[in-house]
Structure formats: structure tokens, C-alpha cells
């Protein structure tokens, strides 16, 4: 059971103008981009050479909630937490890395570089979580930057990129002209452990769900079906390459498609950190 932090540590958002502190959630502006905001948590013990945990919001843009919910876990596990903010007007295609508009992957790399410089945290390998649309971004980031990723946890993505080179990105991993620098190395991304978490009540075809015919046919009709299918396909492709990679799929008890309820009822925070940092 996770011990709660003090009220100040768990809920405070410290303005950027205040010097960086430990044990509080800091709101910062990226030094190289005055329009880019992110939230940062540096644990009381740690920072220097600490691992970096990144949590990515979905279309609700609830970055503050992500930062507040995960701060206690970052403290307990001694990791530096980053929660990037991606407003829809700047990142209209962030779930797919950014084929149009600003490139969410490039901005995240800049944030990570700044945090590593400010805190001394290790940016060699990243530990990522995303919920809903944020989970779509996270697994596509893993596909594009496998050398930067240690492990990921995906919370109820609406649909997935498949490890299929005959299908054009973002449905598959066939490169596209609008992102020529992104090439996919299946041997590398299939080596990264992944856990998919979906609420056991997350079986509605709601307005936000991709209902295209091709996604329904290839992946299933609900987030539960699609998550299970993707884990099975990734595991199969890894085995074909002789890779003993861990892929996990878990249903969260009494949880619909809601970040807050999945954290409160479904134990999503505990399951996320248990998978990302099994040695801690």
C-alpha cells in the first residue's frame, strides 16, 4: 500500500518563477520554447542519476491531474516525474507523433534533455505511461525511439499501431513521406517490455473511440478487445524473432474509461509503477 505524501507534496503546483524544489510538483516552461509547459516532480531523495518517469495525458488534457496523482509514486520510487502538456491547438496530431502541426515526440525529447540537465537525472532510458490518447502517443514513441525506452505502460488506448510493415504508419510501421526521419526497427521495439491496462467496464464504443472499418477489422471493436489483440500480436512477433520480451494485459476492476476512476478503483498507479520499476 502506498503511503500518502503530505498534502503540500501531493497537491501543490509551484509557479515557474519559484526556484526548483524537491518534494513538490513544479510547473515549468521549456527554456527553448516559451509556449511549452510541463510539470516536474523531483523526489526528496534522488534526482542525481535518478530514472525518469513520464506520464502523458489524453484528449482531456488533464496534465495537472496526472502530475498530482503520480507525484506520490515518484517520491516512493525515487524517480523524477515529467508530465508534458500538449494543448490541442499546438498538437492536433500528437497521438500519432505529429504528422501535422508540432511534433510531440521532438518536444518531449527537448523536455527530457532540459530535465536531465537541471536535475542530473538519467535520460538514457525512459519509463513511460500514457492514458487513452496519451497511451497512443507513448506506444508510437516506443516504436520510433526504441533506443530511448526501457519500459512502457499503456492505459486504455483507443487503437494501436501494429508491428506490420505492410501497413502504413500509424496503422502499421511502413514509413511515411511526411515523417522521413522516422524508421522502425522491429528487433529493437519488440525487445521493450509493455503492459496494457484497460478498465473492465471500458467496453463502450463512445464518441472518442476510432470506429473506422479497418481498425474494427484488424483490432476489434472495444478497447478491451483491441488491447488484448495488440498484446497477443506483439508477443507473437517477438517470439518469431526469438525475443523473450514480457507483454502483459490486465483488466482494472470496477473501472470505465476514466483516468481518475482507474487510479482510484482500479489501482492503475500501483500496477503502473510495479511494472515499470519491478526492482524497486
Predicted regions located by residue number:
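Short beta-to-alpha linker loops that shape the active-site pocket of alpha/beta-hydrolase fold enzymes
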Residues: 85-89, 158, 255
